[in-house]
Amino acid sequence: MDIVNNLFDFIEKYSQENPMKLRLKRFENLNFNLSFAIDQIESRQKIKSKLPLWNQNKKLLFPSVLSAEQASSEITAKYKQCIIGSKYKSICDLTGGLGIDSYYFAASAEKVTYIERYPLYCDVAKYNFDVLQKNNIRVICSDSLKFILECNVKFDAFYIDPARRNSENKRLYDLRDCEPDIIELQSILLKKAPVILLKSSPMIDISRAIQDLKFVKEVHVISVKNE
């Protein structure tokens, strides 16, 4: 427990410092991973405005700075919760990430399954959900495609937010280029849940996406503070 307390004390002490300068600074006799601690500081600085409630909870952790950058805002997560969270009992979040969407789905759905392929993300998600007292979220460490193909359980709804950057960190706008490829997976997904909620880039060609996807019922274009 001393390590955990020391970690959180360090994060709190240097919460307003420049992360880049902290990485160049020398610290003695630390009993925790310095890089991970500074990642927490940088992540909290990035989510301060879009995730104010999470930022207020000093016991929450972030698996990476990227997870904080790419996470849904509380406003958009609540909006998605209103779309499917209150209507369906079991929801599967196929692209778990930081877990913001799973957390808000779990506020109204009976059961939420969080899928993420990176073990660290899963470990942090389990820890955070425990801190947040969300015991109706099941965390599974698996590639989403592998999970879909092997899973025999049916859900009321899937949520998917495909990665929209390639290995060179360039933005992707075509659904077929994103990972996982929802165009390829849609038939399989619809056999295991009647509803799919898909988040895509604001730069997407909506008309083409409607043609590529089957049975599109609604398109929601969301803007938060002109973004």
Regions found by a protein language model. Give the residues of each.
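SAM-dependent transferase fold signal centered on methyltransferase-like domains
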Residues: 1-227
